[in-house]
Structures are given as C-alpha cells and as structure tokens.
C-alpha cells in the first residue's frame, strides 16, 4: 500500500442491516457493499466485521419474532450465517471482488498461538486483495466465553492486523454529549482524545433493539483501539459515502484519536491486556510499585509478597499491591509452585534473585491503557 492507502476495519451492526421487521434488508446490504467496493477501488484494504446472522436466519426456522432463548438464537445463527455470507459473496463478486468468511470465538484470541495464527491468516487474505468478513461464531459460543458484542471483536481485530482506522457504523450519528433519544438538544461530539468517566456517564447506553451493542460497548471498543494507537470513527450507516468520508476525515460523526505522545501497545501487549485472561495473582511489596510502574523495571523474586492461585510458566497473572489494587498484567517465567518454593527457601530465592519473574516486555501496566484491565 502507498502512504495514501489505508487498512480499514468496518464494523456494521444488525440494526444497520435489517428492515423494520427485523429481517436482513437486501437494499441496506447492497449499499454497504457499494461503499466498501469504493474503498477497494481506491486501493484500501478492507476487513468487514458484520453482525446479522440471527436476523438472517430466524424466519427460516419458522419464528415470527426474533428469538429470545440462547438455543433458538444459536440455531438461527447457524442458518443465517450461511445465508449472510452467500449474500455478501454474490454482491462483492458482482463488483469483481472475492469475500472470505472467518468465524471467531473468544478462545481463538485467549490462546496466544491461535491469536497469532488468526493474524497471519487475515494478513494473507488482505494482501491478496480478499475482503475478509468476520463474525463471532454464535452457534457454538456460550455467554461466558463470548466477546460480548461485535464492537469489542472489531476493536480487537483492528489491533490484531495493525489497522489504520476502525469505523463502526450504527443507527446513530455518533457520540452525543447526552442521550439523543432522551435529550432533543443533545450535541454531537466531533472528536474525542480521551474517553473520560464524564463522557461515559453522559453517553448513557443508547443502543438499538436489534443489536447487542449500545453506546457503552462502542466506547469500550474505542478505548481498545486508542490504547493500540488506532484511529476510530463512529457514524450512521445510512449516510451516503460515509466510509470514504471517514477515511478522508470529513464524515459527520465522532472521531476517536489516540494520544500521539503515548506509546501504542504492540501485539504481545495487546494480547496480554485484552485477550489473555489471568490465571492467578502475584502480590508485590508496596515499595516495589515505584520500580515497576515509574522506573519500568522487570519484576524480580525479592519484590514478591504473596502468590495467589496456581499457574504455570508462561501464564498471564495479575500483579497486585498489598492492598489488592491491580497494577497490571504480565506473563510469568516461573510456575506458582516454583515461586512458592523460593519464598520458603531464602537460599533459593537469593540464587534466583537475578532472574526476572515477569520481564518488562511482557508486562502491561494499567497506566499504559485508556481501558480497565
């Protein structure tokens, strides 16, 4: 790609793809594809994160209304995902582009090897001119192992592939200083450089009845992209030419701009911070916090006050102070059993004192993030 060409993740929610009756609207699908095709014709790489599997499938199972129970939703998604990707593929092919399908579960991201494998696959597809279409594998995913919604998934995918821009298309114009559905004179916020508690409180939870992601989930998604050094945009899906304008910086909506002075998290730290899932805790002496946070030092055995849980070498653990306040997350070089042996045996601890328990390169401090760990 040239300097003017960008790698863009486009996320579209169910509410932006469905009719008033809750079914997939072929007209809305066609308009979305036409906008993505324009980006492709301009030389951009585009990855689409698309909801809509349940909406595409539930009528085929004989349901009059969108189902409420998990088995019914998963059955609807099983039928709908095939129909949705078929519709996308035909539309893109009519413009000369090939689409691919990638169904992801949270466990694909929590395992580092699979996480890296997903990235490699996506990079090959994008470099070969393919349009990957991503969705969570709703048919096999249970609630406790879900991303939560496709807003979160799209943000993590954007970081995974080093995207230049994440564009979330919805049924609202952007972020307002109050909920526009409840406050008629609410003003559109054009640019956000920090997502503060005040912004979150004023946003409320404006969302649609069709999708699962309200404004809170979108703000959480943009916290992830901002920590990863990626620009974000939130705008209305039915605005003509909005994807092109979003790249040009002229679209009506809200831009989320990462801090140019802060260091963006690399892939390793993104995985640790947003995907890994801690398996235990290491409690450090309070006087060690300065070395870990301010002086950015690795964590050594002499700093350990206590160890909670059972974990193996290579696991991700939480680093806590003596009051239980979380300092960050890190990958440990030693198992919990080995660390406990060192704690009991002063001679062994002394012999191991030069070996880092958590290397600085494998540690993410909460101060590095604009999103809670």
From Swiss-Prot:
In the Enzyme Commission scheme, what number(s) does this protein have? 2.7.2.11
Positions contributing to substrate binding: 51, 138, 150
Where does it localize?
A: Cytoplasm
Domain PUA, which positions?
A: 279-355
**Which annotated residues bind ATP?**
11, 170-171, 212-218
> Which controlled-vocabulary keywords does the entry list?
Amino-acid biosynthesis, ATP-binding, Cytoplasm, Kinase, Nucleotide-binding, Proline biosynthesis, Transferase
Q: Which SMART domains match?
A: PUA
Gene3D superfamilies of this UniProt entry? Acetylglutamate kinase-like, PUA domain
Mind telling me what this protein is named? Answer: Glutamate 5-kinase 2
- What organism does the record attribute this protein to? Bacillus licheniformis (strain ATCC 14580 / DSM 13 / JCM 2505 / CCUG 7422 / NBRC 12200 / NCIMB 9375 / NCTC 10341 / NRRL NRS-1264 / Gibson 46)
């Amino acid at each position: 790609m040239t300097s003017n060409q960008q790698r863009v993740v486009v996320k579209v929610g169910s509410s932006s793809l469905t009719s008033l009756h809750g079914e997939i609207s072929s007209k809305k699908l066609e308009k979305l594809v036409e906008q993505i095709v324009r980006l492709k014709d301009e030389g951009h790489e585009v990855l689409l994160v698309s909801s809509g599997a349940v909406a595409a499938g539930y009528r085929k199972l004989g349901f009059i209304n969108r189902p409420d129970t998990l088995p019914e939703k998963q059955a609807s998604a099983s039928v709908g995902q095939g129909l949705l990707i078929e519709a996308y593929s035909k539309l893109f092919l009519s413009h000369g582009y090939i689409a691919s399908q990638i169904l992801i579960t949270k466990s694909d991201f929590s395992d580092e090897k699979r996480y890296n494998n997903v990235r490699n696959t996506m990079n090959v597809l994008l470099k070969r001119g393919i349009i990957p279409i991503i969705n969570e594998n709703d048919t096999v995913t249970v609630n406790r192992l879900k991303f939560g919604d496709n807003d979160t998934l799209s943000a993590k995918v954007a970081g995974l592939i080093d995207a230049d821009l994440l564009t979330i298309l919805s049924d609202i114009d952007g972020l307002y200083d109050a909920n526009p559905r409840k406050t008629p004179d609410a003003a559109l916020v054009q640019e956000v450089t920090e997502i503060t508690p005040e912004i979150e409180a004023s946003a409320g939870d404006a969302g649609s009845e069709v999708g699962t992601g309200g404004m809170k989930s979108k703000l959480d998604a943009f916290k992830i992209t901002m920590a990863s050094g990626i620009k974000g945009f939130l705008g209305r899906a039915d605005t003509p030419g909005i994807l092109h304008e979003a790249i040009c910086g002229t679209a009506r909506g809200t831009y989320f701009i990462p801090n140019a002075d802060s260091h963006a998290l690399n892939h390793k730290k993104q995985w640790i911070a947003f995907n890994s899932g801690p398996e235990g805790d290491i409690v450090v002496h309070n006087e060690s916090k300065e070395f870990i946070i301010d002086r950015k030092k690795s964590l050594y055995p002499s700093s350990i006050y206590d160890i909670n849980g059972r974990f193996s070498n290579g696991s991700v653990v939480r680093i806590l102070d003596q009051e239980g306040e979380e300092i960050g997350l890190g990958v440990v070089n030693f198992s919990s059993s080995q660390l406990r042996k060192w704690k009991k045996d002063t001679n062994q601890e002394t012999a191991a004192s030069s070996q880092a328990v958590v290397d600085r390169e494998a540690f993410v401090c909460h101060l590095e993030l604009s999103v809670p760990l």
